Amino acid sequence: KHSLPDLPYDYGALEPHINAQIMQLHHSKHHAAYVNNLNVTEEKYQEALAKGDVTAQIALQPALKFNGGGHINHSIFWTNLSPNGGGEPKGELLEAIKRDFGSFDKFKEKLTATSVGVQGSGWGWLGFNKERGHLQIAACPNQDPLQGTTGLIPLLGIDVWEHAYYLQYKNVRPDYLKAIWNVINWENVTERYMACKK
């Protein structure tokens, strides 16, 4: 069974950039719901497999993708953030960003624009294309997980569902994007990058 991961910091730790009320609801209610619904869906899926009921298996696919994706995405998201975050990455990750996007500022602009431009709910991602050995920016709708839908390995995800920012930034998604760069945990993103290069 899947369980809700603990946050590596307090709900109020990312203030003033993301307030405690948002973090508490986002983690203890939204992410928890994905975990619970994923467990229920997997149980039903196992039953359908045991019965050889292919129709039921197919009918459960959207719930599996939505709740499984929600759990995968948020588990990455919490570690991508830190009260000691912000600034720029160092070392190999920074070199790769410069190589693939021209400069850190251009990368930031591109990921911001991609995330702001998501229609409705979804995510903006920095991913690693293992075949090409390059970094890539992508957007995924709803809770579609990056790797499961594009093959890119997720390094940095920006949640642009309204529940991630509305209580603080209302409908002004660009202000939320501007703020989130102050709490990006580049150490975590770098660890993910180094791991997929092995």
UniProtKB/Swiss-Prot annotation:
Catalytic activity: 2 superoxide + 2 H(+) = H2O2 + O2
Broad EC category: oxidoreductase
A single GO molecular function term of this UniProt record: superoxide dismutase activity
Free-text remark on how the cofactor is bound: Binds 1 Mn(2+) ion per subunit.
Cofactor: Mn(2+)
Gene3D superfamilies tied to this protein: Fe,Mn superoxide dismutase (SOD) domain, Iron/manganese superoxide dismutase, C-terminal domain
Binding site for Mn(2+): H26, H74, D159, H163
Compartments, record wording: Mitochondrion matrix
GO biological processes: cellular response to oxidative stress; regulation of transcription by RNA polymerase II; superoxide metabolic process
Modification type N6-acetyllysine: residues: K44, K51, K90, K98, K106, K178
One Pfam family matching this protein: Sod_Fe_C
Modification 3'-nitrotyrosine, positions: Y34
Post-translational modification: Nitrated under oxidative stress. Nitration coupled with oxidation inhibits the catalytic activity. Acetylation at Lys-98 decreases enzymatic activity. Deacetylated by SIRT3 upon exposure to ionizing radiations or after long fasting.
Keywords in alphabetical order: Acetylation, Manganese, Metal-binding, Mitochondrion, Nitration, Oxidoreductase, Ubl conjugation
EC number: 1.15.1.1
Superkingdom of the source species: Eukaryota
Entry-annotated residues carrying N6-succinyllysine: K44, K51, K98, K106
Subunit record text: Homotetramer.
Function: Destroys superoxide anion radicals which are normally produced within the cells and which are toxic to biological systems.
UniProt record similarity statement: Belongs to the iron/manganese superoxide dismutase family.
Protein name, per record: Superoxide dismutase [Mn], mitochondrial
Organism: Hylobates lar (Lar gibbon)
Taxonomy of the source species: Eukaryota, Metazoa, Chordata, Craniata, Vertebrata
